[in-house]
Design a protein with these regions (language model features):
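Active-site-proximal mixed secondary-structure blocks
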Residues: 25-26
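Amphipathic alpha-helical interface segments
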Residues: 12-21, 31-122
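Conserved phosphate/anionic-ligand binding catalytic regions in large, soluble enzymes, centered on
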Residues: 1-16
Length: 122
């Protein structure tokens, strides 16, 4: 997020959407927090599984950091705060339909599926 190579902004957005639906309203509501955390963990796992499937990765996705996902897709991570590295990212297909936009689509798809199921329960 914010070109830092840390947690993928797409999954952060998916988690934020999930929290809007099932998150707690009061900080002391630990029961709601625990229930939401279970769903967030499930969403994160689904995101990694769907990335593996849609990008035809053979091994497991270990985490959801941007740099790690870049390594999986392009064979290397990029330092996105460096203009030359951003150019290399673009040249590698970073914003092509098989790059970052596809990762964002995976996160949106997984979130939409989960949120749809939650809304049906209401």
């Amino acid at each position: 997020m914010a070109r830092q190579g840390e947690t993928c902004g797409a999954i952060i957005g998916a988690m934020a959407a999930l929290n809007l639906v099932i998150g707690r309203e009061k900080i002391k509501d630990s029961q709601t927090y625990q229930a939401a955390m279970i769903k967030a963990i499930e969403l994160h796992s689904q995101f990694k599984e769907e990335l593996k499937k849609q990008f035809d990765f053979t091994d497991e996705i270990r985490n959801s950091t941007c740099r790690y996902i870049q390594e999986k897709i392009y064979g290397r991570g990029f330092i996105m705060t460096d203009p030359k590295e951003r150019e290399a990212f673009e040249a590698a297909g970073g914003h092509s339909e098989k790059g970052c936009p596809k990762v964002c689509a995976v996160a949106a798809e997984v979130a939409a599926r989960e949120l749809s199921e939650l809304i049906k329960q209401v």
